Amino acid sequence: LYFEPVTVEDVLTIYEKEKPEGVIVQFGGQTPLNIAQALKDAGVKILGTQPEGIRLAEDREYFRERMIALDIRQPESGTARSLEEAVELGRQIGYPVMVRPSFVLGGRGMEVIYDEENLKRYGVEAIQVSPEYPMLIDRFLDNAIEAEVDALADGTDTFVATVMEHIELAGIHSGDSACAIPPVTIAPKHVRTIEEHAAKIARDFQVKGILNVQFAICDDEVYIIEANPRASRTVPIVSKVTGISMAR
């Protein structure tokens, strides 16, 4: 058992000493995903979803393109690399919008913006938007119901353990929202759509292991919010409720 920072240098030191079969990056939150490619480049064998598949989910622009190709509906969105681009995107999408920095942990910096003045304030004060620190802008789905799934996949087949319905409306970070298992108000047709979308994404990204996908249901349509090829905070809850040890 090691108590060390999750950095490339520290992981490599342990890897060289212990000589394991490989490294699993799915169970440490966002940080291991961020260093997966560097570990693979250093000769570490990555077990489960490969860094290439992880990048597909993490790169928001590429993710948007893949969702279009898979015919999965998503809120209108864009990536701004300057304050001017952010203002133009805000005008195109229409307010309110959901804004967040790219490549952050656990939804940090996420905010709902209702007008151009506050968008400018956010871009300057909150994240200092730039080519190195782009801003993600999505149409905010007002009064939407948020749903979430934890799935297991082997690159071909996908098993969705359950669909969770968030008690709070979409826009409240999932870490601050209670959820119901099984869903209470989500129509069966939407539950089926959510399960089908999760399976499509798992196959397309060649997920091997755990996949967490978040959805929003608005105006009788299912929208995808994001997909993360890793274990989420809900895995222990899902395992307890369903009696299925997802980590095992």
Model regions and ranges:
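A short acidic, amphipathic alpha-helical/loop segment
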Residues: 34-38
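A conserved helix-loop-beta module that forms one wall/lid of the active-site cleft
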Residues: 49-110
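Intrinsic disorder at enzyme termini
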Residues: 40-42
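Redox-cofactor binding/interface segments in oxidoreductases and associated redox assembly factors
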Residues: 25
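ATP-dependent carboxylate activation and anion-phosphoryl transfer catalytic cores
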Residues: 1-22, 30-33, 45-48, 70-71, ...
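Helix N-cap/beta->alpha junction signal
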Residues: 28-29, 60, 82, 115
